[in-house]
A protein has these predicted regions:
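Contiguous surface segments at macromolecular interaction interfaces
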Residues: 2-10, 16, 20-63, 91, ...
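Short alpha-helix capping/helix-loop boundary micro-motifs
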Residues: 88-96
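Short, well-ordered loop/turn sites that connect or cap secondary structure elements
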Residues: 99-101
């Protein structure tokens, strides 16, 4: 990574004043910057996180990409894979699990790795506690859950769907064409 010399000088002065190393401060700045950007993205997501649309036809299967929250809580990610379920936590996100219909196809996305499992939403909404917070975990079993394939990276997803979608938000709606392309790729990986 190249950093302008004027910025390096400022970092060195701060490092000296704070009795820290240059690389330590750079790491702090990067971490703080990432945290701030994540907060900004979450604020952008909140008003538009309703996964339903006005023209939804009750008879059509819908497709969704669910970020498993690995970067925040790895245990949530592993629990979803172990139990073959889709889950979300806390107001603003958990309601998306409630809005799923039986038969909707859910792809589980592991940040930095890719789509690592999928199945069709079951009919029963399960509401449980999350990390001591009452009723803050909404989940649904994913019927016919499959996870025994090499994860499909974000780049591969974009390539096979010929589209760009946001992997960072908790849950996003995919088009039928995007969903079909991902299912096709998973089936190819399982027979390879």
């Amino acid at each position: 990574m190249r950093i302008e010399s004027s910025i390096v000088n400022q970092i060195d002065e701060l490092a000296s004043d704070l009795n820290k190393t240059r690389s330590g401060l750079i790491s702090i700045f990067i971490t703080g910057g990432i945290e701030e950007l994540v907060k900004q993205l979450q604020q952008r997501e909140l008003p538009a996180n309703d996964i339903t649309t006005v023209d939804d036809d009750e008879s059509n299967i819908r497709y969704f990409l669910l970020n498993t929250n690995y970067n925040n809580t790895p245990s949530d990610h592993f629990l979803m894979l172990k139990n073959g379920e889709a889950a979300a936590f806390y107001p603003g996100w958990k309601e998306n699990i409630e809005r799923l219909r039986e038969g909707d196809i859910i792809f589980l996305y592991h940040s930095g790795h890719g789509i690592c499992g999928y199945g069709s939403a079951g009919s029963k909404l399960n509401i449980t506690d999350h990390q001591g917070d009452k009723n803050e975990r909404y989940s649904r079993v994913l019927n016919n859950f499959v996870s025994n394939f090499k994860p499909i990276t974000a780049k591969t997803c974009k390539d096979i769907t010929k589209s760009n979608f946001n992997f960072r938000i908790t849950m996003s709606r995919l088009t039928k064409e995007q969903g079909d392309a991902i299912v096709k790729k998973i089936k190819e990986l399982m027979t390879a």
